[in-house]
Amino acid sequence: MPTTLHTTSSTEQDWDDIIDSLEAEKCVLFLGSGVYQAPGGDSLETSLAKWLETEQTQHPSIQVYNDDGFFLFRNARSHKRKVTAQIKNFYSQAFPETSARFAQLAQLPFNIIVSLMPDNILVRTFDELGLNYQPDFYFRNRKYPEHFEKPAKNKPLIYNLMGNIEEPESLVLTHSDFFDYLESMFLARSMHPDLREELEGAERYIFLGLPYEKWYFQLLLRVLSMHSEKLKDVERLALQEFQNPKLQTLYAEEFKINFFPSNPEVFIADLYQACQRSGVLKKLPTPDPKLAQLPDLSAAELKELIASAQTEQAISHLKAFLDRRKPRSYSLVNDLVVLRNQYNLLRQRELRATIDSRDLPVEHNQIVERLMDLIDQAEGLG
């Protein structure tokens, strides 16, 4: 049965016990918005609300933006699509503080990381570090992919539990979406049974930055535990990230969550140091010398690679070109990281047959168009 640690200080924490469960691939990490720091230092929710200008009294697309984070759109389809595109742009920004935390987290030997967020900042970080991973996400009321690769610490599963921004129809943005999502979870429609078995077989869950104060989180925890006696009884380690003692008592008693007085940034740093002392951090791959030796290509030559269906090679050449022009190229480097991540995710979805064949060329062409635009901008760097 999964175990947890009782409330203690970070200096007294039994890191060896956590490391043992990590090494045994029996420790699952759950991430929420509290792990993030948005550009400018705001919380993720505050920054996203500003980005979407939700305070407008006559917002053209959003009729109501609730405190629980759910939207009511003026037009359910067209306005939802517009706001989804804005949210995608928001997460495509550079998140330097969050990326720094994730760079430490990516080197920890978790075999499964479950995110309640829809973004791909963590997988972008894995890409930047050259670390292996497998991405997947929950798509409510859709059949899960037939293929399932067992997660491993050298190739962890990064699983977006409430949809992925690259698949807009999978996102949970409205109350209606959420109740559809709960129905899908209740009927066990869209999560691969082998993944559920992996979650049931864990010895420890670690919760970081989850929305304990939101009304729907309690409901989500209950529904997630309905199909397994093991999941109902799982004990969890979580950080004491809120001040309401009644709420803490509720989670401690109802959900067997034991709280640890810390915050995500400190906890990740402390666990990183403990893993470093124990010699279990993942080793970062050495830079590919072939990439450094790639010649600079002109914009016309890069576009010719794209025209010849050599998109991946064009991305590699553009990366080498931009790397040689830092710091002037930093903003374009970040844009290319986002684009490369989107390309890799699209390839993964194609291989796993989780994308409609009609959508594949459309999304590929969108990536190519953005790549061509980056090439044009890079040409100005000389």
Label every PLM stretch briefly:
Residues M1-A106, N111-V114, D119-L122, N132, ...:
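Gly/serine-rich nucleotide phosphate-binding loop at the start of the catalytic core
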Residues Q313-R349:
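Short, charge-rich amphipathic alpha-helical segments embedded
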Residues Y133-E200:
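Active-site gating loop/helix substructures
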Residues E301-L302:
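Conserved small-residue packing positions in alpha-helical repeats and bundles
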Residues I306-A307:
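Hydrophobic/aromatic side-chain positions at a characteristic register within alpha-helices
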Residues M1-L29, V35-P39, A100, L129-L131, ...:
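SIR2/sirtuin-family catalytic core signature
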Residues R347-G382:
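Death-fold interaction domains
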